[in-house]
Amino acid sequence: MDELTKKVLNSFAHWRKETLDLHELFEAGGNDPDARTAVFDIVERLVKEGLLAEEGNDFYSLTDKGKAAAKEV
């Protein structure tokens, strides 16, 4: 698992929230526009892989599978 994906998964623990909006998840990429674009792609991939759940209005939460993966990183 790449470092940016780990940062995205760990964002929930960092912010101490069950649900994060896309802008909070972008923080994993810092101020680098390319990294923020990569975060968007990672979020889409994690949804497809079942690690994140879309909650509507650009909000996301960790699924049980995502919580397990976050504990491993």
Region spans (language model):
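Short, intrinsically disordered, low-complexity terminal segments
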Residues: D32, G66-K67
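Short amphipathic alpha-helical interface segments
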Residues: M1-N31
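Minor-groove-contacting beta-hairpin "wing" of winged helix-turn-helix DNA-binding domains
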Residues: D58-D64
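A short, conserved structural fragment
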Residues: V47-N57
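Short, amphipathic alpha-helical interaction segments positioned at domain boundaries
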Residues: K67-V73
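Short amphipathic alpha-helical interaction segments
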Residues: D32-K48
